[in-house]
């Protein structure tokens, strides 16, 4: 069996845990890195996460460059990879259409073309919003005929980051279908930390919610008692990604990685506040009111809330029958999401918010 695989976005939160998981299970990940000088530091992080850094290697490349910026030697090394994991994105709020498309859309297409050229299987990480048909219709995505979607209008409605993730999904599907490639997509919910250690990186939406609570900036809970922020622990997500990538039955399929037992947003805030030892808000602010306030100049900075982030807070529930069948086939059970939430809050408090 060919154990070599290419990983984009390996330096990110999911990427670090995926490299640890793959290397721990005998795979040999090749990491695409813009700054290859940071590879030793990445190896150290992978070791700390329980991986085998000796299984890792790196090639210099860039998602924003033609041909991924690979030189001849790197192309030969990548050509030996039977599986490509595409996690690399530019994540930031307030991205322009051009900024978001450069890496998140064009970069994804470059990875897809590399997979087709090398006859490699592609595992792409999408997002759970792509599994919400009502949301897609609301923001103007023509899911059945995506080529007819007015993408600039979608970007204006949901922001550059989410717009580019949506567009990349449909563009890559079309590219792989046209070329007869093997594609599997995993759609993760919002990430919380490792189930046991709580490890996570700052800047994640879950971590930002904890930060707002820790700094006592969260005065009211967005939405209503029906709203929730669907979660998945990072360790279980990367386990699902690895299993899906090497499952022949998952070629041409997608997998929703979302824990339906995630508490509603009120319950999540209460659980975080208990660990952080702060008084949680009890009142709700209607989503429409909050979005209207955030449309006022200067309010997002004052409240430290990004308007784009509100779309991830949902009322809709999701069909997990395919996911549960996948787990049953692989003899896996959902880990306790309450444990992951508590461990994540403790890790964030000890690592980043101790002085708050």
Model feature map: region roles:
Residues 5-27:
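N-terminal Rossmann NAD(P)H-binding glycine-rich loop of SDR-like oxidoreductase domains
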Residues 51-56, 60-106, 114:
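NAD(P)H-binding glycine-rich loop region in Rossmannoid oxidoreductase-like domains
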Residues 83-86, 106-160:
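Conserved Rossmann-fold NAD(P)-dependent oxidoreductase catalytic core, especially the SDR/UDP-sugar
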Residues 152-156, 208-236, 240-244:
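A conserved pocket-lining segment of Rossmann-fold NAD(P)-dependent short-chain dehydrogenase/reductase
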Residues 154-184:
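Active-site Tyr-X1-5-Lys
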Residues 179, 194-207, 244-255:
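Glycine/proline-rich active-site loop of Rossmann-fold NAD(P)-dependent oxidoreductases
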Residues 265-317, 334-338, 353-356:
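Terminal hydrophobic/aromatic helix or amphipathic segment near a protein terminus
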Residues 318-356:
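Amphipathic terminal alpha-helices
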């Amino acid at each position: 069996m060919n154990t070599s695989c290419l990983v984009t976005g390996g330096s990110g939160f999911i990427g670090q845990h995926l490299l640890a998981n793959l290397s721990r299970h005998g795979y040999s990940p090749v990491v695409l890195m813009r700054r290859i000088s940071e590879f030793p530091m990445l190896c150290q992080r992978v070791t700390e996460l329980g991986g085998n850094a000796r299984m890792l290697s790196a090639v210099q490349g860039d998602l924003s460059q033609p041909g991924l910026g690979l030189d001849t030697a790197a192309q030969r090394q990548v050509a030996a990879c039977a599986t490509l994991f595409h996690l690399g994105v530019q994540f930031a709020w307030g991205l322009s259409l051009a900024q978001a498309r450069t890496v998140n859309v064009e970069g994804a297409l470059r990875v897809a073309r590399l997979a087709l050229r090398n006859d490699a299987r592609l595992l792409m990480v999408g997002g759970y919003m792509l599994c919400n048909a009502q949301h897609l219709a609301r923001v103007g995505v023509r899911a059945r005929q995506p080529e007819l979607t007015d993408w600039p209008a979608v970007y204006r409605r949901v922001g550059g980051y989410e717009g580019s993730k949506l567009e990349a999904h449909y563009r890559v599907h079309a590219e792989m279908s046209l070329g007869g490639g093997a594609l599997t997509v995993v759609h993760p919910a919002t990430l919380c930390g490792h189930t046991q250690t709580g490890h996570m990186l700052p800047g994640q939406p879950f971590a930002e919610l904890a930060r707002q609570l820790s700094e006592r900036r969260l005065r009211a809970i967005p939405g209503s008692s029906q709203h929730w922020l669907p979660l998945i622990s990072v360790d279980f997500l990367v386990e699902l990604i690895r299993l899906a990538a090497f499952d022949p039955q998952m070629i041409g399929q997608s997998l929703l990685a979302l824990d339906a037992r995630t508490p509603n947003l009120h319950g999540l805030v209460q659980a975080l506040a208990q660990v952080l030892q702060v008084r949680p808000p009890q009142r709700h602010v209607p989503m429409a009111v909050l979005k209207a306030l955030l449309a006022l100049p200067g309010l997002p900075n004052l409240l430290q809330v990004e308007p784009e982030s509100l779309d991830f807070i949902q009322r809709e529930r999701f069909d997990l029958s395919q996911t549960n069948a996948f787990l049953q086939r692989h003899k896996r059970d959902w880990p306790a999401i309450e444990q992951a939430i508590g461990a994540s809050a403790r890790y964030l408090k000890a690592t980043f918010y101790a002085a708050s």
